[in-house]
């Protein structure tokens, strides 16, 4: 009924459409365009620069370890040292029902010079009650931390991430 050319063209258009839908859904809500909208292209481009400097990597990994300890905290706020952790304080999860945390933080990149810099991380955190029921959590999120050396100690001074 249709010439063979039109049949192939419709088939190719259908395949192209399905491929686009699948690839867009795979990106989730925080694809590259969402990151660019929130952070701007210049900051998103920072994530492509690999840091190989061992000193800078140690600073970043030490701060990531501190953040993981803070995110892994379960319980009330009693006995925590919130004053000494800078902007990482926002990652404390105070809930008396939480007895276990499943936290993952990956270093994306870092750059430091003249006592200031930034760290890009990708993280997720889930919190469970005594019955091992999820009570709170978030999927993977990218976060950019501004860092500064204050009184000889590297500190996260600002956290920027998509809400």
Residue map of PLM features:
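Core segments of small alpha/beta cavity-forming domains
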Residues: 31-106
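Bacterial N-terminal signal peptides that target proteins for export
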Residues: 2-14
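Short beta-strand edge/turn micro-motifs at domain boundaries
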Residues: 140-163
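N-terminal hydrophobic targeting signals that begin at the initiator methionine
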Residues: 1-2, 28
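Sec-dependent N-terminal signal peptides
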Residues: 14-20
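C-terminal motif of bacterial Sec signal peptides marking the signal peptidase cleavage site
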Residues: 23-26
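Surface-exposed, charged secondary-structure patches
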Residues: 93-135
